[in-house]
C-alpha cells in the first residue's frame, strides 16, 4: 500500500483494503503525470498550492504551446482537490473552450453569467450560467485569449467578490464560489487585460516537448503505446529503429501530435498484422511525415531492426 498504518487490528482483509484506500487517497495525485519529479515538478507544486489556498484557492493560468498538456494538468488539479477534501464529491468541473465562441462573444458572456428568459432573441428559458453550475467546484476557461475585452472585464469584476449580474436581471446580484483556472497558447501580456492578469496571481509556463528530457519523452512514447495495446487488445512489439525515429522526431504539436503519430503508426501495424496475436511495428508503419523528416538521421531508419516488447523497452531505456 505504501502508506503509514496507524491501526494495529483489522477484522478482515476487506477492512484493511478500505482503510488503505482512505489513508492513501490523494497520495498518487499528479503522480501519473510523466515529469512529476522532473520538468513538471515546480508546476505541480504550484498547482497544489494554488488550489489549497484558503478560502477558495488562488486563480491559476497555464501558458504554453498547443499540445503540451495544459488541460490535462488542470483536470489533475480538480482530482487533487476532490481527493483532498477541497471540493465536495458533488463538485463539478466545467471546461469551456473559449475559441468556440470567438465569432460570438456575446454568447459566451451569456453562457458564463447566465440570462433570463426574453433577455435576447432565442432566450426562451432561464439559464443559470456556467459560473453558477460550477459553484463549489472548478471553472476552466481554455484558450482564454479568445475572450473579448468586455467579457474579460466582467470576469475580473466577478473575481473580486464572487458577485455578478445575470443578463436580463440588473436588479438582483448573484454569488458563486468557484475556483477559476485559465489556459492560453498566447503571450498573456499581449492578449489579456492587465486588470484581469493582476487578478491571476499564479501564472505558470508549460514546457514544449522539445524542452523535456529524453527520458520523459521516452516514457511518454511507451505510455501511449501501452494505451494503444489496451485499446486494440493485442501485444505490441516495436523495433528499436521505430523507437529511435519516434524519439528523435520533432513535434510541432507537442504531446498531442506525438499521440496522433503513435496512433497512426499502430493503425498501420494492425492492418499489416491482421492474423497475428500481436502487432509488429517496423519503420514502414511510421507516417511518411516522420519517415521523411529532415531532422531524423536516415541511418536510424536503415539500421538493424530489433524487436522489443513494451516491458523490454521500459527496462532498456
Please report, for each region that a protein language model flagged, where it lies by residue:
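Interdomain "pre-motor" coupling segment immediately N-terminal to P-loop NTPase/helicase cores
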Residues: 1-22
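Dynamic helix-loop-helix/coil hinge segments at AAA+ ATPase domain boundaries and subdomain interfaces
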Residues: 19-44, 106, 245-252
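Conserved post-Walker A coupling segment in P-loop NTPases
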Residues: 49-121, 137, 145
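Conserved Walker
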Residues: 57, 84-88, 119-131, 144-145, ...
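Conserved AAA+/SF3 P-loop NTPase catalytic/coupling segment centered on the Walker-B
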Residues: 74, 102-113, 124-160, 189-199, ...
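Structural recognition of the conserved hydrophobic beta-strand(s) that form the central parallel beta-sheet
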Residues: 140-141, 178-185
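Conserved C-terminal "switch" segment of AAA+ ATPases
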Residues: 191, 195, 210-244, 273-274
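C-terminal helical "lid" of AAA+/P-loop NTPase domains
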Residues: 256-271
